[in-house]
């Protein structure tokens, strides 16, 4: 379990956060119109950079979803009173009074541990959305630069 937590910590540490992604894009979005050829050459490098970030956040989003499902199952057992003393101690929880089956959803929706797990999932999904938008812009940049080069040739009489 300790190794799992260490790997998880390292994975989170090396992953870019949303603010970093936006800062990267602020810098990478600038184009030097005086040298469109160089800008065309940069597109695959930028694509690789953002594809790597996208992949990390997609995996993290899925992992957060699975963590949520596992946590939800544990909390259902906890709130329904089906956990034994060993399981309670393993999680550091106090015994919970039995709750009616119809009330369990209310407890699950208000559970801070589960909410944190959902927040993490939503955060990674937002990062995925931002990076997908950046990737679409990079696709468009390719065509924009080619059109710009063609226009410059036309104006120059070539």
What are these regions (language model features)?
Residues 2-14:
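Short, Lys/Arg-enriched N-terminal segments with co-localized hydrophobic residues
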Residues 11-158:
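Charge-rich amphipathic alpha-helical interaction elements
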């Amino acid at each position: 379990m300790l190794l799992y937590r260490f790997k998880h910590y390292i994975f989170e540490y090396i992953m870019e956060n949303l603010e970093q992604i936006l800062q990267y894009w602020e810098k990478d979005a600038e184009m030097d119109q005086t040298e469109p050829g160089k800008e065309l050459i940069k597109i695959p490098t930028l694509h690789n950079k953002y594809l790597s970030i996208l992949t990390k956040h997609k995996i993290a989003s899925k992992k957060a979803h699975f963590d949520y499902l596992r946590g939800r199952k544990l909390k259902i057992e906890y709130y329904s009173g089906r956990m034994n003393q060993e399981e309670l101690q393993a999680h550091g929880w106090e015994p919970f009074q039995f709750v009616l089956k119809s009330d369990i959803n209310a407890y699950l929706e208000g559970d801070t541990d589960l909410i944190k797990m959902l927040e993490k999932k939503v955060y990674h999904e937002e990062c995925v959305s931002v990076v997908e938008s950046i990737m679409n812009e990079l696709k468009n940049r390719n065509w924009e630069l080619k059109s710009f080069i063609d226009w410059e040739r036309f104006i120059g009489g070539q």
